[in-house]
Swiss-Prot record:
The lineage of its organism: Bacteria, Bacillati, Bacillota, Clostridia, Lachnospirales. SMART domains: Enolase_C, Enolase_N. GO terms for cellular component: cell surface; extracellular region; phosphopyruvate hydratase complex. (2R)-2-phosphoglycerate binds at residues 166, 347, 376-377, 398. Its cofactor is Mg(2+). InterPro entries: Enolase, Enolase-like_C_sf, Enolase-like_N, Enolase_C, Enolase_CS, Enolase_N. It comes from Lachnoclostridium phytofermentans (strain ATCC 700394 / DSM 18823 / ISDg) (Clostridium phytofermentans). Belongs to the enolase family. The gene is eno. One of its GO terms (molecular function) is phosphopyruvate hydratase activity. Its EC number is 4.2.1.11. Binds a second Mg(2+) ion via substrate during catalysis. It catalyses: (2R)-2-phosphoglycerate = phosphoenolpyruvate + H2O. Catalyzes the reversible conversion of 2-phosphoglycerate (2-PG) into phosphoenolpyruvate (PEP). It is essential for the degradation of carbohydrates via glycolysis. SUPFAM superfamilies: Enolase C-terminal domain-like, Enolase N-terminal domain-like. This is Enolase.
Length: 437
């Protein structure tokens, strides 16, 4: 009789992310010799309701950012929780680790430790059954490649520039395939670089690979992007749309610091706006530019404001909740009940396990909303999010610029998946967006 597959050993180690900060990597070894390895990413602009990323706090080591305690939890408590269990039962594995932690926000053992083991288990299980990860998780229906939401200009917390808006992205909706979408986007990226250089701007890149020029205003960034799309030979508002991540919670918090609670401070330019002025501002930008998606247009605590924003712009553009929902089904279901936003950004480490991530995607899609699988600003060479995007047929991925290996690794994995799927591969283009009827 064939021996049942089980988890035999779990290893943990401290490695570096793309910002030079330590993160947790886990390695799961199965009874048949199959191995899975995964690393936890890390964010710079984080939501208050995210699961806890455990850091050592020892200022004498990595300026307090070490993760040796989290690594110890991988080797001890989490290893004890999962060893001997069947790796093909992901739900049970994740539940065992969540129980071992015993807190609401994974604050005892760390979401970074739990997530690394969770993803490594899925990878080991996929290897054991000789399937690529996207197929192991998604079955034969996993064949939709995502439209990239490609970051080409960085601002906010992600860059030392004068831009308040954190990310300006392009979406190649007019392409016929993922590989063509990547080629078109990269052409726009290089065209933008030429334009910036010609006008004397520095073309150094931010955390996510986009340029970080010292522009005078956020609108200037949009002007340059529209020009780059045209100069590259494409049509703005047809071949390409623009997406923005305002990371407005940062603006809300900055206003609080100067005693203007409930308002929004564009801290790099000094402008203070009320909720209604913020909504007017976003609407004006949408009227002027081919904007299709706005992420975190208001703060994570501002549910009333979000309601107004959704009423005003929800039928026109994709309104994405990131800090608002933090990949948490409790918060997503509140958003659904209150009809707030129409899209959810999905980040594994906000919730801290694969099962909970997949549940969040399922809940979002069942509502008829869009789900965007996303990286963090602190990434590694780990490409799991590429497989998850295809496994869940999410239709959209946010994983930075076509520069920096930590970002490009995900695009390259999607190219491999597309080639492997062959004729079965689907690139949704405009169909990925509910608002583009």
């Amino acid at each position: 009789m064939k021996k049942l597959l089980s988890i035999e050993k779990v290893k943990g180690r401290e490695i570096l992310d793309s910002r030079g900060n330590p993160t947790v990597e886990a390695e799961v070894i199965l009874s048949d010799g199959s191995v899975g390895m995964a690393a936890a990413p890390s964010g710079a602009s984080t939501g208050a309701f995210e699961a806890v990323e455990l850091r050592d706090g020892d200022k004498g080591r990595y300026l307090g950012n070490g993760v040796l305690n989290a690594v110890e939890h991988v080797k001890k408590e989490l290893s004890e929780a999962v060893c001997g269990r069947n790796p093909l039962n992901q739900v049970e594995i994740d539940a065992a680790m969540i129980d071992a932690d015993g807190t609401e926000n994974k604050g005892k053992l760390g979401a970074n430790a739990i997530l690394a083991v969770s993803l490594a288990t899925a990878k080991a299980a996929a290897t054991a059954v000789s399937l690529p990860l996207y197929q192991y998780l998604g079955g034969t229906n996993a064949r939709t490649l995502p439209v990239p939401m490609m970051n080409i200009i960085n601002g906010g917390k992600h860059a030392d520039s004068s831009l308040n808006i954190q990310e300006f992205m392009i979406m190649p909706v007019g392409a016929k395939s993922f590989s063509e979408a990547l080629e078109h986007s990269t052409t726009v990226f290089h065209t933008l670089k030429k334009l910036l250089k010609a006008d004397g701007y520095v073309t150094a890149v931010g955390d996510e690979g986009g340029f970080a020029p010292k522009f005078n205003s956020d609108e200037q960034a949009l002007e340059y992007i529209v020009e780059a799309i045209k100069k590259a030979g494409f049509e703005p508002g047809s071949d390409f749309y623009i997406a923005m991540d305002a990371a407005a919670t940062e603006m809300y918090d900055e206003a609080k610091k100067i005693g203007k609670e409930g308002n929004y401070l564009f801290w790099k330019s000094g402008e203070l706006k009320t909720v209604d002025e913020m909504i007017d501002y976003w609407e004006n930008l949408c009227n002027k530019y081919p904007i299709l998606s706005l992420e975190d247009g208001l703060a994570e605590e501002d549910w009333e404001g979000w309601k107004k924003l959704t009423e005003r712009l929800g039928s026109r553009i994709q309104l994405v909740g990131d800090d608002l929902f933090v990949t948490n089904t409790n918060r997503i279901s509140k958003g659904i009940k209150e009809d707030i936003s129409n899209s959810v950004l999905i980040k594994f480490n906000q919730i801290g396990s694969l099962t909970e991530t997949l549940n969040a995607i399922e809940m979002t899609k069942n509502q008829g909303w869009t789900a965007i699988v996303s990286h963090r600003s602190g990434e590694t060479e780990d490409t799991t999010i590429a497989d998850i995007a295809v496994a869940t047929n999410a239709g959209q991925i946010k994983t930075g610029a076509p520069s920096r290996s930590d970002r490009v690794a995900k695009y390259n994995q999607l190219l491999r998946i597309e080639q492997e799927l062959g004729q079965a591969a689907i690139y949704p283009g405009k169909k990925a967006f509910k608002v583009l009827k």
